[in-house]
């Protein structure tokens, strides 16, 4: 299914942060399964606090309005007291639309 319109806030959010984009593409690769914060952090090679900021927003550094969860691209599911982050169906559709435009970026990722 193709999307005719992508919210400009999503485009802006992803263009302003390579880390947000890395996290989104990692979760797309893992879809439909989720992954722990520490594992996301390890795979994208970034500090867990920065990853959490991209996912949920954090103080002034990562605006919550532009977080992957707030934009509806990622969801947090709690299982047995542990938080798992996974791509939403909407997030999957967004990635499928954007991945052709981001082919150079995707090739640069080394999981």
From Swiss-Prot:
Which SUPFAM superfamilies did the record assign?
A: Winged helix' DNA-binding domain
Please give the superkingdom of this protein's source. Archaea
Signal sequence extent: none
InterPro entries documented for this protein = ArsR-like_HTH, EarA-like, WH-like_DNA-bd_sf, WH_DNA-bd_sf
The name under which this protein is listed is Uncharacterized protein MJ0905
What organism is the protein native to? Methanocaldococcus jannaschii (strain ATCC 43067 / DSM 2661 / JAL-1 / JCM 10045 / NBRC 100440) (Methanococcus jannaschii)
